[in-house]
Amino acid sequence: MSQDYYQVLGVSKTASQADIKKAYLKLAKQYHPDTTNAHDAEKKFKEINAAYDVLKDEQKRAAYDRFGHDAFQNQQARGGGNNSGFHHDINDIFGDFFSDFMGSGRRKQTSSKIRGSDLKYDLTIKLEEAFHGIEKNISFSSEVKCDACHGTGSEKGETVTTCDSCGGVGVTRIQQGFFTLEQTCHKCQGNGQIIKNPCKKCHGMGRYHKQRNLSINIPAGVENGTRIRHSGEGEAGIRGGNNGDLYVDIAIKPHDIYKIDGANLHCKLPISFVHAALGGEIEVPVIEGGKVKLTIPAGTQNGDQLRLRSKGMSKIRSTIRGDMLTHIHVEVPKNLSKRQRELLEEFKKESINEKENDSSFFNKMKSMWS
């Protein structure tokens, strides 16, 4: 006849989950085959795990309390159960076991530690700043770690205790027949911990609101719409939880001269009709400052595009630059001096192909309507 599971663990039928777990860890440590040479250690260890397998689960425990071992006989006959204690959650069982036995290992974090929220900051910079890179100081308000209690939420020198009602998980379970209902622990309000003497500065939250100043490094070649992540610079976590992150979204202010196209820059370059006809050199401003000479070919037409290689935007983590593309806009003077008009009239008379061009133009127009 199988031994009563409560007797195996040495607990009463009204024992809490925390008491059941505590008893299990103590016995598992005592009878684990690797820690004792007792001849019946393996048998005892299997019995302990079988008992804990049922009693740690509220639904299985309710069925056991009502029907005893018969509640699991059919399941075992179908091959659906295994009371050896080695068939599931090995890491969870031995994680807690070796944590207590060896003084190390993983532990589940209580719900009192909550990660801080991420923050978003919109930063507008000039085109020249995007080209060269710059360090910007920004100011914003957020939750910061309390310097009085170091984020614990408890008054200095006071200890924070695990809630004995929920065992530190922040929720309690209510058994109703075969159903288990979970609800927020009324004693710790879901925090999993009890702060008997809350910090006066942060009122037990482990953080408080403050205006912050932060230096942001903008790399050279940053593009419009780039998002820069600053890990751990978001809001402080609650009661020692990890900080959130800060995301800085970059917007580049429209420039009076240049328009951005990836790493290339476009600009409108006005020239006189004399320069367009005769050609020559003209100085144009560049993004890094100063001016460079641009060669205008003779006969340049309005709307032509001339390229200055490697005079565009810098690229992040690269020595390669984009190009600068100048869009020619030929300006025709609206007011002419007497001498300028005479010269243009003379040029008009001496135009060799003027008549042919006119004849060609009118012939084409005539053919369109014939």
From Swiss-Prot:
One of its GO terms (molecular function) is heat shock protein binding. Keywords: Chaperone, Cytoplasm, DNA replication, Metal-binding, Repeat, Stress response, Zinc, Zinc-finger. GO terms for biological process: chaperone cofactor-dependent protein refolding; DNA replication; protein refolding; response to heat. It comes from the Bacteria. Its main location: cytoplasm. Residues 4-68 form the J domain. One of its GO terms (cellular component) is cytoplasm. A zinc finger (CR-type) spans 133-211. SUPFAM superfamilies: Chaperone J-domain, DnaJ/Hsp40 cysteine-rich domain, HSP40/DnaJ peptide-binding domain. Zn(2+) 2 binds at residues 163, 166, 185, 188. CXXCXGXG motif repeats lie at residues 146-153, 163-170, 185-192, 199-206. CDD domains: DnaJ, DnaJ_C, DnaJ_zf. Coiled coil: none annotated. The keyword Zinc applies. InterPro entries: DnaJ (IPR012724), DnaJ_C (IPR002939), DnaJ_domain (IPR001623), DnaJ_domain_CS (IPR018253), HSP40/DnaJ_pept-bd (IPR008971), HSP_DnaJ_Cys-rich_dom (IPR001305), HSP_DnaJ_Cys-rich_dom_sf (IPR036410), J_dom_sf (IPR036869). Binds 2 Zn(2+) ions per monomer. It is found in: Cytoplasm. Its cofactor is Zn(2+). Zn(2+) 1 binds at residues 146, 149, 199, 202. The J domain is necessary and sufficient to stimulate DnaK ATPase activity. Zinc center 1 plays an important role in the autonomous, DnaK-independent chaperone activity of DnaJ. Zinc center 2 is essential for interaction with DnaK and for DnaJ activity. Homodimer. Belongs to the DnaJ family. Participates actively in the response to hyperosmotic and heat shock by preventing the aggregation of stress-denatured proteins and by disaggregating proteins, also in an autonomous, DnaK-independent fashion. Unfolded proteins bind initially to DnaJ; upon interaction with the DnaJ-bound protein, DnaK hydrolyzes its bound ATP, resulting in the formation of a stable complex. GrpE releases ADP from DnaK; ATP binding to DnaK triggers the release of the substrate protein, thus completing the reaction cycle. This is Chaperone protein DnaJ. It comes from Rickettsia typhi (strain ATCC VR-144 / Wilmington). The gene is dnaJ.
